[in-house]
């Protein structure tokens, strides 16, 4: 459930009456103080190197569409973007190719299944259903323009950098660790190839997808990227348009319906905002 302070911000945002900078800063500080000692859950270990993350890291970053920054805690500590990259690659591919192509080749419906499931592919004639699950993200990455894998990768890296407002770089250790542990993604790509949902080399596509997930970001970067979508595709820091307002809207709609995987409905009911799990 949303706390009282968060609910106050949400209600003001929904009605167009934005809270003051001081109120936002005080609220973030209070949230950080209140929850920094929470130690439920475990550090992710499905990729070996992720298990090395410090569970005490906790940072909050909020950036307004005008570019005003509100931060507290470990907002400047770098980590790999992982599945959050899916939303922004979806937007970039829609901008470069067309939303209609992605809709036809991938889909926009929630699978109701775990993020790395093969069932959705098998049950829907090879259509992975949406770009937020692994199969759909791999199929979306395959649609990125580029005559070579290197060119496709650079288009993704540079595009995500435009969203972040700075040049993002690959975390080589994360990439190497993930490449050793992503047999399931390779299997998903092979299955998509068998249904002709991807026509590029499946292993090259998984390599590019793994690279995009291994880009190093901070909470600040993600706040800038999210604010770019919220402001209709315009980066609040650089003031540069990254994608059209229509594609920003479509991306937010997909995040609302599919961004939290099989729990997206519950998240939307309880929180009411687009989001993406990492």
Regions found by a protein language model. Name each.
Residues 2-40, 93-209:
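Active-site-adjacent helix/loop patches that line small-molecule binding or acyl-intermediate pockets
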Residues 36-72:
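A short, well-structured edge-of-sheet supersecondary motif
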Residues 50-53, 128-130, 180, 271-276:
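Short Gly/Pro-enriched turn/cap motifs at secondary-structure boundaries
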Residues 66-67, 80-103, 225:
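Active-site SXXK
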Residues 78, 206-207, 213, 217, ...:
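Cytosolic covalent-transfer regions centered on His/Cys nucleophiles
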Residues 87, 216-234:
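Active-site-proximal alpha-helical segments within enzyme catalytic domains
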Residues 233-254:
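Conserved active-site-proximal loop/helix segments of enzymes involved in bacterial cell-wall
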Residues 255-278:
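Short, Gly/Ser/Thr-enriched beta-strand-loop segments that form substrate-interacting elements
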């Amino acid at each position: 459930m949303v706390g009282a302070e968060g609910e106050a911000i949400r209600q003001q945002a929904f009605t167009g009456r934005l809270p003051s900078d001081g109120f936002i800063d005080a609220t973030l500080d209070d949230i950080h103080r209140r929850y920094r000692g929470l130690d439920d859950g475990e550090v992710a270990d499905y990729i070996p190197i992720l298990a090395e993350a410090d569970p005490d890291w906790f940072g909050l970053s909020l950036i307004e569409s005008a570019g005003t920054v509100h931060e507290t805690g470990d907002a400047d500590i770098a980590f790999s973007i992982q599945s959050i990259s899916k939303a922004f690659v979806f937007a970039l591919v829609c901008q470069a190719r067309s939303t209609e192509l992605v809709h036809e080749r991938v889909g926009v419906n929630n699978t109701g299944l775990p993020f790395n499931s093969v069932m959705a592919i098998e049950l829907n004639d090879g259509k992975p259903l949406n770009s937020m699950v692994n199969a759909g993200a791999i199929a979306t990455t395959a649609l990125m323009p580029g005559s070579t894998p290197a060119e496709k990768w650079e288009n993704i890296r540079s595009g995500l950098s435009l969203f972040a407002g700075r040049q993002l770089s690959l975390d080589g250790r994360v990439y190497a660790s993930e490449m050793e542990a992503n047999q399931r993604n390779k299997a998903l790509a092979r299955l998509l190839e068998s249904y002709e949902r991807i026509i590029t080399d499946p292993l090259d596509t998984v390599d590019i997808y793994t690279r995009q997930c291994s880009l190093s970001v901070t909470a600040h970067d993600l706040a800038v990227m999210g604010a770019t979508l919220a402001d209709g595709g315009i980066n609040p820091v650089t003031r540069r348009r990254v994608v059209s307002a229509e594609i920003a809207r479509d991306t937010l709609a997909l995040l609302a319906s599919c961004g939290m995987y099989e729990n997206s409905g519950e998240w939307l009911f309880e929180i009411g905002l687009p989001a993406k799990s990492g």
